[in-house]
Amino acid sequence: MRENCTDYRDLFINDRPMMDARAPVEFHKGAFPGVINLPLMNDIERQKVGTCYKQHGQQAAIELGHQLVSGRTKAERIEAWASFAKANPDGYLYCFRGGLRSQIVQQWLKSEAGIDYPRVIGGYKAMRGFLLETTEQAVAECDFVLVGGMTGTGKTEVLAQLHNAVDLEAHANHRGSSFGKRASGQPAQIDFENALAIDLLKRRAAGQRQFVLEDEARLIGRCSLPLPLYQGMQHYPLVWLEDSLGDRVERILQAYVVELCAEFVAVEGAEAGFAAFAARLRESLANITRRLGGERYQRLAAIMDQALEEQARDGQVDTHRGWIEALLVEYYDPMYVFQRESKAGRIEFAGEQQAVVEYLRQRSGHFPEAPAS
């Protein structure tokens, strides 16, 4: 039998398969990428055992647990664990603290299915603590540089061209602005933090010590940046990305209208998807009514409504440019002008996309290989 595991670094760097024996309610509050939830007890069973533990103590709770998970229920769960173990012979199982629940799963697999399967010592809690420390260590030991710039300048496009970029918005599944919600929703806060930590861990294991991030607010949608990282971002050097208003409008049109509509249609179908997309766009504008002011909001909402009607009728998106350009010029740009002035002392380079990409590659000492002739 393989040994029980305490090497959390190996688990995450090598994407070891893991099954989580916690109840679904625990799993959905926070888990690790790619892990499968195969609980010892469901939510109701866990609640009953927890109440029994508080009222009558550990032994009574253990006895109740064995009563609740018995017969056909027990056999079905053992079958699910055995299927996972056979499909993932290099995997592990865990519960919250690596204690009784994972030990019981381990024992039942052995006695009922003849399978020796190792567990993670310390369980979810220890692995979660390891990942929190991973992020703190990266912030303390690595070099970070931020990419800033007005809305629509293509900061995400810059990140996509860099080997050492960490895309925070991709981890949060959100574009980072008032209009940034995606059709597929955001991860739980803990899932966001765990995935980011694993990303940093893998990159550091590959030898990276310098990272490029987009200059973000503390909140990306409803995902909050880890505090040590956010605090560091208030001091990191900044590269400022520039582009023309026309190019920015086109980029916003593509991302927030064409691509977002396609996302909703892919998830919900043509008719329901377009309706959900239109509702999301209107909701995003309504959410900043107070900051826009009533008159400006009404003007932009009227243009947006006309644009959505035309898009629904014949697929044309040209009219969307009207509210997009007005929103940039009248709302977003003044905020970014203030931000740039307040961060001027940290800006070490400014330019358009290709110049910024080349500067950041030079800064990291990394250049893409030339294509073979």
From Swiss-Prot:
InterPro entries documented for this protein: Rhodanese-like_dom, Rhodanese-like_dom_sf, SelU
Molecular functions per Gene Ontology: transferase activity, transferring alkyl or aryl (other than methyl) groups; tRNA 2-selenouridine synthase activity
Gene3D superfamilies xrefs: Rhodanese-like domain
EC id: 2.9.1.3
SUPFAM superfamilies from the UniProt entry: Rhodanese/Cell cycle control phosphatase
Entry keywords, A to Z: Selenium, Transferase
Domain annotation Rhodanese: ranges: 12-136
Reaction catalyzed: 5-methylaminomethyl-2-thiouridine(34) in tRNA + selenophosphate + (2E)-geranyl diphosphate + H2O + H(+) = 5-methylaminomethyl-2-selenouridine(34) in tRNA + (2E)-thiogeraniol + phosphate + diphosphate; 5-methylaminomethyl-2-thiouridine(34) in tRNA + (2E)-geranyl diphosphate = 5-methylaminomethyl-S-(2E)-geranyl-thiouridine(34) in tRNA + diphosphate; 5-methylaminomethyl-S-(2E)-geranyl-thiouridine(34) in tRNA + selenophosphate + H(+) = 5-methylaminomethyl-2-(Se-phospho)selenouridine(34) in tRNA + (2E)-thiogeraniol; 5-methylaminomethyl-2-(Se-phospho)selenouridine(34) in tRNA + H2O = 5-methylaminomethyl-2-selenouridine(34) in tRNA + phosphate
Active site: 95 (s-selanylcysteine intermediate)
GO terms of biological process kind: tRNA wobble uridine modification
Alphabetical list of HAMAP family matching this protein: tRNA_sel_U_synth (MF_01622)
Subunit details: Monomer.
Stated role: Involved in the post-transcriptional modification of the uridine at the wobble position (U34) of tRNA(Lys), tRNA(Glu) and tRNA(Gln). Catalyzes the conversion of 2-thiouridine (S2U-RNA) to 2-selenouridine (Se2U-RNA). Acts in a two-step process involving geranylation of 2-thiouridine (S2U) to S-geranyl-2-thiouridine (geS2U) and subsequent selenation of the latter derivative to 2-selenouridine (Se2U) in the tRNA chain.
Family membership: Belongs to the SelU family.
Name assigned to this protein: tRNA 2-selenouridine synthase
Gene name tied to this protein: selU
